Amino acid sequence: MIMSKRSFLTLSGAALAFAVARPAWAQAMKVAIVMPGNITDKSWTQSGYEGILQAKEKLGIEIAYSEKVVQADQAEAMADYARRGYNVVIGHGGEFQDAASRVASRYPDTLFVVNNGQEGGDNIASADFNFRQFGYLMGYVAGKMTKTGKAGWIGGQKIKFSLDLNSSYEEGFKAAGGQEVLTAYTNDWDDIAKGKEAALNQISQGADVIFPTMDNAVIGSLQACKEKGVWAFGLYYDAIVDWPETVLQSAIFDIKGAMLTYLQLAIDGKLEGKNYNFDLSTPEAARLGTFNPAVPKEVQDEVLALAEKMKSGELKP
């Protein structure tokens, strides 16, 4: 989730003009979110849904949402909310970046935000995470826990989120003494059967620690790991709660916290047309999960020390 990005932002002239031009809303702001998957997927889409509900409760906004919106329909779904007078329209996933770019100029009075996006400008903002920090730390744990010297990593598609997580996971794995990372893409974020098949294939090749990074398809990968008795990592939430015998640690990309931050800025008239990046220094939005008791205390301490070095800037995966 990752990147060597700007850490809470460089202000461009265009972004400044965008922020200054936006007055604070005197009445309830209307916010809509368009999501790619199912709101009960215990993964990325559910986190976005919970984020908009939390924002409604804490910020007093009026909300609407659409789920299971395929990529071909994303631009029209975002445009429809803009036509209906929503002040902020959120595309929940990096794949919405193109859709936001296509419709934003037609609705200059609407603010478009892309969760897990990388770009901003005019009336488009984006929010993402330093995925590389977390990929490295999960990889380091894997390198300390593997018995075969092989780990697995599974992604949905080859987008920046995936590429950054994959490469940093391999970097951390090898830094901890691991030898080889097997990489696979399902080309489907939500197909549970494909997630399970990919994990089983890696396990058959000797991987004994696997990091699945899709959306709903992660469930299939975790099922495979549980059935075969190999370790795995969680994503987006503290997955050890649901997989206590399988998950070693989790990379928590808490989009709920990020959404609260940028929607408060929008209410105050201060949301800028730029990228907002969250990392270990912003634990309300990005943090480690709970260590499985199987992870030795010395390994836990090493990982936490690495995290501190990342916060200070001494270590940049």
How would you describe each model-predicted region?
Residues 27-317:
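A residue-level marker of the well-folded mature domains of exported/periplasmic proteins
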Residues 1-25:
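N-terminal secretory signal peptides and thylakoid transit peptides that target proteins
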